[in-house]
């Protein structure tokens, strides 16, 4: 007669040995890895603009809310934000990421906002293990910066969907970021919504503050580059977008520093050959910032 208890114990121990997992709690985390879904999740690049968009009911935030209704409910959200710019690549791996108010000079109401979405430590570990081009560190200090929560709180206001952030390694070339994104492709098949959050055209030093309320007011170079970026995206000419330094004087004005542009390369790196592209919030603000956003898939 086979002792059922001993039999299942042997099977369990064999599974631990096969997977290299050392404990029951670790096995639980392993078993909770997201399954493959019957659909492929779209990818977004979102122009996040001013932190005030996080609390305002305007055309931008309304589009964020509506696009969430047009895509499947995600199992988790992974954001590559312009505002987590680090030496090395990190991913948030805490149970409860804090809401970070990483800005100054705004109304008190903005600093009072909390977005208490859960983290997803086991998914953070799984994501880190997918990336072979660099060592990804599990981070327990950061949280959700305004490049993330100002958008997500309009998309998923009940804060019930787990949210993670992946940092941007400032020591790496644009081609590195584009290639790293491709290593995350499997997440799309697991229902994870990946969002690059920045701005294609982002020159704060040239903002026309007196024109902020003038719809679509833009400098000639900003309008030129907004159109050029869209055309290159539609033609899938990703190499030209990776090597943006070749885009002339207008390109230099549009991207004086790379941190708000690089999230776009993550979104484009995740584009499959058959993925359609659609633009939304396609407008210029204050002359030198574009809110132009992209839905891929």
Residue ranges and their predicted role:
Residues 1-22, 29-30:
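N-terminal secretory signal peptides and thylakoid transit peptides that target proteins
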Residues 33-135:
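A short aromatic-anchored loop/beta-hairpin motif
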Residues 42-47, 76-81, 166, 187-200, ...:
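Beta-strand elements within well-structured catalytic alpha/beta cores of enzymes
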Residues 63-70, 175-190:
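Long, well-ordered alpha-helical scaffolding segments within enzyme catalytic domains
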Residues 110-118, 140, 167-174, 251:
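Flexible, glycine/proline-enriched loop segments at strand-loop-helix junctions
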Residues 123-178, 183:
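Internal, conserved structured core segments that host functional sites
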Residues 161-162, 172, 186-193, 200-297:
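Surface-exposed, charge/polar-rich loops and edge strands
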């Amino acid at each position: 007669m086979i002792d059922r208890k001993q039999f299942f114990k042997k099977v369990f121990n064999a599974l631990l040995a096969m997977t290299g997992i050392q404990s029951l709690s670790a096995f639980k985390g392993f078993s909770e890895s997201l399954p493959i879904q019957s659909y492929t999740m779209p990818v977004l690049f979102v122009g996040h603009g001013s932190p005030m968009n996080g609390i305002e009911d305007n055309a931008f935030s309304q589009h964020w809310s509506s696009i969430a209704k047009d895509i499947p409910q995600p199992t988790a959200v992974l954001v590559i934000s312009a505002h987590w710019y680090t030496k090395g690549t990190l991913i948030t791996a805490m149970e409860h990421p804090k809401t970070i108010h990483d800005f100054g000079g705004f109304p008190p109401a903005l600093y009072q906002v909390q977005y208490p979405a859960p983290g997803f430590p086991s998914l953070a570990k799984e994501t880190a293990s997918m990336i072979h081009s660099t060592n990804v560190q599990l981070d327990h200090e950061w949280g959700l910066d305004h490049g993330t929560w100002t958008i997500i709180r309009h998309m998923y206001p009940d804060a019930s969907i787990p949210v993670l952030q992946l940092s941007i390694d400032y020591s790496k070339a644009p081609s590195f970021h584009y290639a790293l994104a491709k290593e995350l492709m499997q997440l799309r098949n697991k229902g994870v919504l990946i969002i690059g959050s920045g701005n294609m055209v982002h020159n704060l030093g040239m903002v026309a503050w007196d024109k902020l309320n003038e719809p679509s007011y833009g400098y000639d170079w900003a309008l030129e580059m907004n159109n050029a970026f869209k055309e290159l995206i539609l033609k899938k000419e990703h190499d030209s977008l990776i090597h943006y330094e070749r885009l002339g004087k207008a390109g230099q004005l549009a991207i004086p520093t790379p941190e708000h542009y690089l999230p776009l390369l993550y979104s484009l790196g995740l584009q499959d050959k058959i993925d359609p592209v659609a633009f939304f919030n396609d407008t210029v603000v204050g002359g030198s910032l574009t809110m132009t956003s992209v839905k891929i898939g």
